[in-house]
């Protein structure tokens, strides 16, 4: 159902959605040069002077084109998403775009829920390996990300193609913090899971508390193999460079403390000699 109204109305409707994590695409303004949406929701757009290079490339290669297609298709369908083919915006679906915000006359807007979003994470049937980044971003024009993950071959050890996949397997995001995400994964066979989170160095993956390898898929997302059964998968932002910086800082502080103690010791000894 559509709720038409001011920006406050659409904000309230989307904020009332208690789904733990999703993204919003604002088509009612300059998508990549406004930050109001990002203030209230996780946004596909928003302005940032230092946007990640890969995400910027995805905007130019896929997202902008899909946005235009969505705007046209949904408008022609009168807002009825059942009349809109999901094949027209696969990248927006893999980015967990749950709501589109559409402009109306009189400065009003309407939020339209996307029934085709792939959610926070999903099992794929196959992994398609490519030789380089150019082939990776190009392959997204031809695959269905709900079924296939495109992986640069340099991540072939971290993201293996599963022999079989449980189509009834479930993945649920159970906790979300900016630097810590937890998922409950349950499947009979295990398989390759793609997570709708940006792949970035410094994130560590764990299965039931034990560190596990993960790699990049679909040019910007994370992927890993999860074994059969019920497991807790966790991602923590714990960059090793930060630990190195902390170690250097502690060593520097220790040296400074020793120098200060030595200086005070010499000052006291000098003062005593004068008294004597």
Short names for language-model regions:
Residues 16-31:
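Gly/Pro-rich turn-and-neighbor structural signature
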Residues 126-146:
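Short, cationic low-complexity segments
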Residues 32, 37-131, 161-168:
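A cross-kingdom signal targeting lumenal/periplasmic-facing segments of multi-pass membrane
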Residues 2-5, 9-10:
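Short, small-residue-biased leader/transition segments that mark boundaries at the very start
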Residues 10-13, 263:
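Short, low-complexity export/processing leader segments characterized by acidic and small residues
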Residues 1, 26, 30, 112-114:
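Transmembrane alpha-helical segments
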Residues 98, 107, 141-276:
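Active-site-proximal, structured, solvent-exposed surfaces of multi-pass membrane proteins
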């Amino acid at each position: 159902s559509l709720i038409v109204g001011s920006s406050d109305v659409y904000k309230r409707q989307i904020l009332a959605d208690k789904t733990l994590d999703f993204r919003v695409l604002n088509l009612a303004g300059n998508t990549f040069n406004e930050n109001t949406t990002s203030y209230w929701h996780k946004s596909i757009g928003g302005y940032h002077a230092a946007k990640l290079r890969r995400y910027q490339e995805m905007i130019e290669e896929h997202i902008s084109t899909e946005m235009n297609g969505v705007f046209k298709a949904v408008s022609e369908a009168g807002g009825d998403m059942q009349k809109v083919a999901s094949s027209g915006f696969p990248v927006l679906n893999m980015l967990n775009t749950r709501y589109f915000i559409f402009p109306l006359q009189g400065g009003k807007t309407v939020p339209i829920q996307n029934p085709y979003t792939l959610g926070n994470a999903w099992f794929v049937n196959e992994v398609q390996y490519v030789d380089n980044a150019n082939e990776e971003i190009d392959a997204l024009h031809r695959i269905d990300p709900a079924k296939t993950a495109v992986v640069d071959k340099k991540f072939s050890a971290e993201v293996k193609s599963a022999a079989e996949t449980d189509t009834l397997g479930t993945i649920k995001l159970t906790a979300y913090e900016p630097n810590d995400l937890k998922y409950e994964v349950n499947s009979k066979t295990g398989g390759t899971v793609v997570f709708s989170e940006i792949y970035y160095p410094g994130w560590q993956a764990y299965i039931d508390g034990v560190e596990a390898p993960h790699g990049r898929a679909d040019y910007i997302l994370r992927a890993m193999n999860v074994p059969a059964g019920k497991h807790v998968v966790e991602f923590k932002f714990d960059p090793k460079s930060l630990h190195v910086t902390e170690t250097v800082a502690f060593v520097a502080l220790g040296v400074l403390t020793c120098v200060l103690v030595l200086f005070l010791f010499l000052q006291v000894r000098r003062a005593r000699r004068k008294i004597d």
